[in-house]
Amino acid sequence: GIEEILIITGKNKKSIEDHFDKSVELELELEQKGKTELLEIVRDISQMVNIYYIRQKEPKGLGDAIYCARSFIGDEPFAVMLGDDIVDNDVPCLKQLMSAYEEYRTTILGVQTVAPEDANKYGIINARYIEDNVYKVKDLVEKPEPGKQPSNIAILGRYIITPEIFEILENQAPGKGGEV
């Protein structure tokens, strides 16, 4: 399971660190009001995982943010979860991805189908069908021109990535907008 969380932040994002920090004030207030059950829940949450932060010096894209984590990650596979996608499912998305990783032992992307007319709003995969909910990705197309998308299967902001990505990112030239 996941025991450590690394959050890549940028300039003026101190509130993210504050949000996930231990809340001494809240614990004190709950204790003073005799709300011991809630106090235990709050304390248990703060002990669930260790959270670390690395600041991305410039906003140079997702690839650069992932590359910032290389010394923290080492040589283990890792999960990437982008905060701008909310996934609500009976089986949590990350659990599904971890199960797929255990079976295939390779980088896993979370995907979803989108209406063809909305494909230009997403990164879209060009892939070969393997079995239900499993595709072998040939290519990724970021926000394709309307009508030119290879499929209507969009990349969700959830990934399990192998550490080989760091070698690829190290040699990756910046793309559109200077992003990696």
Residue ranges and their predicted role:
Residues L26-E29, T36-Y129, E170:
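Conserved beta-loop-beta/alpha segment of the NTase-like Rossmann-fold superfamily
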Residues I8-T9, I54, G157:
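Small/polar loops that bind or transfer phosphate-bearing groups
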Residues T9-K13, L26-L30:
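Membrane helical hairpin/interfacial module
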Residues E4-T9, G110-V111:
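Short internal beta-strands
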Residues E3-E4, E76:
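Short acidic/polar active-site loop segments enriched in Thr and Asp
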Residues E17-V24:
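Glycine-rich loop at the start of a catalytic domain that most often binds anionic cofactors/ligands
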Residues A79, M98-E102, Y129-V180:
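Catalytic-core segments of class I nucleotidyltransferases/pyrophosphorylases
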